[in-house]
Amino acid sequence: MSIGILGKKLGMSQFFDEQGKAVPVTLIEAGPCRITQLKSSETDGYQAVQIGFGEIREKLINKPAKGHLAKSGEDLVRHLCEYRVDDLDGIQLGGAVTVGDFAAGQKVDVSGDTMGRGFAGLQKRHGFSRGPMTHGSKNHRQPGSIGAGTTPGRIYPGKRMSGRYGGKKITTRGLTILKIDSERNLLVVKGSVPGKPGSLLNIRPANRVGAKPAKGGK
């Protein structure tokens, strides 16, 4: 049973399927993650499994986190993540979550922080068209009109303008696991995932499997 796992993005490559077609893939080093806490309905009001991933030096972790990990008898970890479960049977405190809990062909959702691009303009951030480059125009990469004058006399909230681009947590849904390498803790996932190489990823079973519903909910 796969509840979820934390991993590190290694980069992108290509994978050849049975027909010899090159498929773009992402290599993810996932786990092994130790189970650091079990939450039950009796003690916490819901059932969940908390896992830890990544090494950290003792001087860089605070006392509350150190005490929390000491209860489970686990080594210090850099990242903690919690997953809701319906049943805690067969899950033990101190156990390991590995890539072997997943299967080739399984659909997963991958969450991570997108690459930060700093302060960006309208063309790069929102894909706006630029202004004329010749004939005396000075409006090359400026936003142009951003609203009316007297009415409403203000800029509506949510207006697309320049600002910070990237560095947000997003989820890419319905990616397919093409291959699993248990010896090297690798997941080969079809397509791209958020973040740059070395960034933290959260991989969990897809909660939307199947064809998209038709418009109107029918």
UniProtKB/Swiss-Prot annotation:
Q: Which GO terms describe its molecular function?
A: rRNA binding; structural constituent of ribosome
Q: Does the keyword Ribonucleoprotein apply?
A: yes
Look up the record and give one Gene Ontology term from the biological process aspect: translation
Region Disordered, as annotated, extends over 126-163
InterPro entries linked to this entry: Ribosomal_uL3, Ribosomal_uL3_bac/org-type, Ribosomal_uL3_CS, Transl_B-barrel_sf
* Assigned GO CC terms: cytosolic large ribosomal subunit
Cited Gene3D superfamilies? 3.30.160.810, Translation factors
Q: Which domain of life is it from?
A: Bacteria
Q: Does the keyword Iron apply?
A: no
Which terms are listed as keywords in the entry? Ribonucleoprotein, Ribosomal protein, RNA-binding, rRNA-binding
| Record family assignment | Belongs to the universal ribosomal protein uL3 family.
The record describes the protein's role as:
One of the primary rRNA binding proteins, it binds directly near the 3'-end of the 23S rRNA, where it nucleates assembly of the 50S subunit.
The annotated subunit structure for this chain is:
Part of the 50S ribosomal subunit. Forms a cluster with proteins L14 and L19.
Q: What is this protein called?
A: Large ribosomal subunit protein uL3
Q: What is the lineage of its organism?
A: Bacteria, Bacillati, Cyanobacteriota, Cyanophyceae, Synechococcales
